[in-house]
Amino acid sequence: LRYLSKFHHFIINHYKNHQFSTSPYLCKDDKTQRMTQTITGFSKLTKEEKINWLANTHFSNPTQALSILKKYWNDDPKLQQLHDEFIENTISNYYLPLGVAPNFTINDKLYTIPMAIEESSVVAAASKAAKFWGDRGGFKTTVLGTTKVGQVHFTYTGDKSVLADFFNTLRPKLISDAASLTANMEKRGGGIKTIMLVDKTEQLAHYYQLHCQFETLDAMGANFINSCLEQFASTLEREAENDARFRQSELSVIMSILSNYVPDCIVRAEVSCHVDQLAEKNINGREFAEKFLQAIAIATVEPYRAVTHNKGIMNGIDAVVLATGNDFRAVEAGVHAYAARSGQYSSLTNASITDDIFTFWMEIPLALGTVGGLTKLHPLVKWSMELLGNPSARELMQIVAVAGLAQNFAAVKSLTTTGIQQGHMKMHLMNILNQLEANPTEKQQTVTHFKTEAVTHSAVVTYINALRN
């Protein structure tokens, strides 16, 4: 209260000591002066106090700034409070469109896939690929592994053989000390899989790690893994201090943390058909297949192309990961690391033609969860999970991988046939019209006009201006 009193006193004096015009816009000099002042205790302010401070400190029209923030608040106070408590210093909700891509056949089962994304044409491309492959046997998927990783990083300056002997006696103590943390996970069939001592001193002086593998079943497992790792670190330090073979401060734990690189948590997704089945209007099946293979080969050897190639895959993956309440940043980091595992960044997808059978596939690491986190808190995440039939983590891995493969197929198909802009810009047309503040009649006329014309921003501007003049 004392702080708030001082803060309010500062605001009052500030308004008294500065001249403002009668318009809602602050004079430039005043805004510049207030922008240079820091604030302490911001997190302790109420939500209303936070947004008032932001509006009056950073915006030339505070009333408008407040109005925009509040326009996106939910009318249901309990639902808004739920969103407010997801993160810190929440001031409003940031909307992304939630779309769906129907008609995905995965292992002979039909799915409608939820996709949360702001980029136009992604959902349409996924839907188109789903229909294309649905008529050709659908997508086939296999989970190749679900092992997740965490590490205790530490330094050791003593004799390596002493450390190796010490670790052999330490390992069972690490597991027993973490028993209270792993009991419930073990009842469900998960838990600690392996703990290995890794010598990294050739890469960095005195650097060692405990490299630990876990099975977390339907949980993404971040909290479980990190809790186990911190217990391992505590046990490691305690046992080293009590071992006469170690000198004081000879072993020092640096940090304990899970890894988002999970090369043993892999899912494979693929499609295949006879090359003749790839034929469509004005497209020869074999020619298309051979050109498609060449496009994949280019992305395999050329990092500049591979980055954009894989970004397109992640358009599909991220959209489903986000819609299902999973951590898309973790997935992105792990997938891109996997794409560079050979030492050069390369394509995540592969293609082949064998005995006239075209096969297109991808193997990627996906550490996902269907319990915990936002999966049971966010109403739209729960809705998305039910839309998918409340899948297990293994099933969700397969669905997400298929979304990425479908997206990549659609993109490479467009690139090697009509070009990417034709389809993308038609989907982007509505965004351009909204930027130009087109009314419903103008939108309808413009959409009709560009059904047979190439869509560019300048062409749309010219057409709208012609309508209005």
Name each model feature, range by range.
Residues 365-469:
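Catalytic-core signal marking the mid-to-C-terminal active-site face
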Residues 84-96, 127-139, 176-202:
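Conserved alpha/beta core surface patches that mediate binding of polyanionic ligands
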Residues 138-144, 181-194, 239-260, 328-334, ...:
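Flexible, glycine/charged-enriched surface loops at secondary-structure junctions
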Residues 139-168, 339-401:
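A structural-propensity feature for long, helix-poor, extended segments
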Residues 33-111, 115, 119, 139, ...:
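Acidic/polar, glycine-rich intrinsically disordered N-terminal extensions of enzymes
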Residues 98-125, 217-225, 300-325, 404-411, ...:
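Conserved phosphate/anionic-ligand binding catalytic regions in large, soluble enzymes, centered on
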Residues 225-237, 245-246, 251-380:
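Glycine-rich anion/phosphate-binding loop at the beta-strand->alpha-helix junction
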Residues 148-300:
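Glycine-rich, mobile lid/loop segments that gate access to catalytic sites or pores
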